[in-house]
Amino acid sequence: KNLRILSFLHGIYLSDASDNLIVGNELKDNLNSGVWLTYGSSFNVISGNRMFGNYYGIAFEWSSFNTVAQNEINGSTVGILVYSSSDNIIFKNRISFNINGIVCNVQSRRNIIQCNDIVSNSGFGVEIENSHDHRIIGNSIRDNWAGIYLHESYNNTIYHNNIMHNSPHQVYIYQSTCVWDDGYPSGGNYWSDYQGSDSYKGFGQNQFGSDGIGDTPYSIDIDDVDSFPLFAQITIFDVGVWNGVAYHIDIVTNSTVLDLCFNPNEGPLFRFNVTGDDGTNGFCRVAIPKTLLWVEDGWTITVGDQPVTDYLELEDESFTYLHFTYNHSIQTITIRGTRVIPEFPLVTLTLMILILATLTTIWKAKRKH
C-alpha cells in the first residue's frame, strides 16, 4: 500500500497468492509489469494505483476471481492483460495512451469489463481473442485505432457502451459471435457514427414517438447488428449500496448532464442538472431501478419549474424508463416517485438493533447495581 516502485522486472508479483489488497501504489517503468498475478492467484483487489510505462500495466495469468478497480494505467504495451483467466472484474479504470487497452485471450472466460474509460490507445481499446462469455458494459471506448476487436470468440455480450470516434474501426470482428444489445427497452450501445433518427418507438420501432432508441439497427458487419442503438451518449451514475446491492441510474441524453443527487432521506426523488445550447431541443431517457424508486400513480417530472406531463414510460423486469423532452438551457430536472428504498439498509438496521440491545442490557445491569 502507498508504495512507489520503479524500474524493476515486476512492480508487484503474486504467485498462488490470494486475498491480498494492492492499493494506492505508483508503479512506473517496470520492465515486465506493474502488477503480475499468476498460478491461481485469486480474490485479490487491485485498486487506486497509478501505472505508467510498464510493459503490462496489470497482467493475470491463470488467475481468477480478482477485482481491478479505479486504477490509472497509461504508457504500456497492454494496459490490462487477462491470459487464460476467468471471472475477474475490471471496473472503473482509466486506461489511456497505451498500445492496447484491455486484452483477454487464450480461453479466458466470464470476465466483466464495466464502466471503464478506455481512451486514446493506438491499437485496440478492448481485444477479445479466443475467449468467451465476457460482459462488456457501460464503458467509454473512444479515440482508439479500433474500439473493440473480436477474434474467434463467442457468446460475448456488449451493451450500454459509448463507442465513439475510433478510427479506422469502431469494431473489428473475425469469426466471432456476440450480442450487441440488451433488448428493448434497455437498448444497445451509443455509436458516434450512427446515422439513423428517433421518430418511432416500440420493439419494432413502428409506433410514432421518440424513445431514445434509434429507429433502425446499427450495422456492424454483414453478420452483426446492434438492434436497439442508443440515440445519445449514456451516463451511468452510482447512487448507493443497499443490502449488498449497488444501484445505478442511467441517463441517455443529448444534453451535458451533471451532479445527480439521490438521498432517500429527502424522499422518493432525485435530481440532476442539464445544459445545452440555448434554443435547441434536449431529451433524456432515464433508467430507474424498480427496487430503488417506484410509483403507485404516475411520476412527477419537472424541468426547472415547469412540469412535464407528456412523457413516455416503459419498463422491463428490473428498470423503469422515462423519456421526455425540453428546451435547452441550464436546467435542474427533478423526478419524483411514490416510494423509495428504505433509508437504512438491512445490514445497518440490524447493526443498530444489536447496538441498542447491547446498550439496553448494559443499562439494565447498571440499574441492578
Where does each model-flagged region fall?
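C-terminal membrane-anchoring or membrane-association module
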Residues: L359-H369
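Glycine-rich beta-solenoid repeat tracts in large extracellular/virion proteins
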Residues: H10-D16, S33-G40, Y56-W62, V78-S84, ...
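Surface-exposed beta-strand/loop patches in extracellular or lumenal glycoproteins
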Residues: Y172, T275-E296
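C-terminal beta-strand-rich structural cap/linker in extracellular carbohydrate-active enzymes
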Residues: L230-Q233, E315-V340
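Carbohydrate-binding surface patches
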Residues: V252-R285
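Acidic, glycine- and Ser/Thr-rich low-complexity intrinsically disordered tracts
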Residues: R109, I137, Y154-V245, S318, ...
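Short, threonine-centered small-residue motifs that mark membrane-proximal processing/anchoring sites
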Residues: R339-L349
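Consensus "Asn ladder" position of solenoid repeat domains
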Residues: N2-L3, N20, N25, N30, ...
